[in-house]
Amino acid sequence: MNQIDINDSHYAEDELHEECGVFGVYDFDGNDVSSTIYYGLFALQHRGQESCGIAVSDTEGPKGKVLSYKDMGLVNEVFNPEKLEKLNGNIGVGHVRYSTAGSSSRENAQPLVLNYVKGTLGMAHNGNHLNAVELREELSYTGAIFQTTIDSEVIAYLIARERLNVPTVEGAVLNAMKKIKGAYSLIVMSPRKLIGARDPFGFKPLCIGKRDNAYFLSSETCALDTVGAEFVRDVEPGEVVTITKDGIKSDKSLCQKNTARCIFEYIYFARPDSKIDGMGVYESRINAGRILAKTHPVEADIVVGVPESGNPAALGFSMESGIPYGNAFIKNNYVGRTFIKPKQEQRESSVKVKLNVLKEAVAGKRVVMIDDSIVRGTTSARIVNLLKAAGAKEVHVRISSPAFLHPCYFGTDIPSEDQLIASGHSVDEICEIIGADSLGYLEVDKLSEMICGQTGYCDACFTGNYPIEPPKIDIRGEMG
């Protein structure tokens, strides 16, 4: 058996990250939208914690004038009332971002604002496209001067170039989509239009909302709830939605039958109070727990979830198995992006700063611990150790997703295969490495049952069945 050193700094970061969240507003009554976008981004903060930004325009003002501000940090760190007051405009777009190592900088924050021969556009992007290198070289050859290292700027320049050949911005977006290979949900703002676009596979979510005389575009419905907007519908995979003062129009010419919506939105990324493509995220996680209880039963005294995403699945496991559900963990909500990672010899203490165990809840008991995933195994090992140190007699780990065996090329920060514990170890070996008494994963063939029979999702990180052929070199370092 190949033993993994769980204290190795190579395995220090053991969480999955969604890359971005996008949010846009067009208020037909002329009200400023910067504060509304701020609250929308606040609701999407879980999708990206490294940088954020807002860009706005006044549809009755000078046609090329776009005001924007972006910086590194959380939404409430970057923006204050004074900054928001300076962002005057009734149409706008916002963005929260997580990036991989090496690409985190203010220059790479979004929204991007691009001035070009036909005017100005602002753009927010969630996803990753696979032919960005080729398109970047092509655009550079024809005169594009790139200011960032992200593939989002490639899309912005591509739209600007296509705008030279068609009479409308939405037509340029549609033409650009025909050239982009990969995953993306976009919100594009011109001074008179707000445009939403979703790739033909529908990897990343995007939905439409309405409040009074304002229309919204958002990565998740939870942000619509936060700003008091009603959910209208999801943007369909391949669809381009254009919002103007005359209302909404849609182009579905790129829609296709075969879709590949990211299944991990339901397992982990999306907030539990969101609905994606008609399916409630909370319900899907309850279902995952119920399925685990049927496929991997165990005799135990208490079921606990690793906060926060493990809690609904733990409740579902309890409901199906009859084993009481309990709270074993106290989470420190003040440990965030700025938490200083300890030196290697102190690394074991880092989980204790984030989580503490209620000893009276687990002492002397057989515990079922539910978590959403195991990536490298480091976090699972430390949490199992915390439970046993608190007196748990047995710890049985149940995972509400299949085993991660392959990297993702579509906008999710899943490591390479050599860093995925399940790629090189059997279930029994992983069980020994993390110190659990047993381990069970949700089976791949149960994913459809988890989302109530829906199909058309991407499970490539579990199966290796990529809906788009992955690149021969790893291009995942610069995601939108």
Q: Can you say where each PLM-predicted feature lies in the sequence?
A:
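Secondary-structure transition/capping motifs at alpha-helix termini
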Residues: 144, 165-166, 297-301, 319-326, ...
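A conserved beta-strand->alpha-helix junction
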Residues: 148, 153-158, 325-336, 433-451
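Mobile, glycine- and charge-enriched loop segments
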Residues: 356-370, 374-375, 399, 470-480
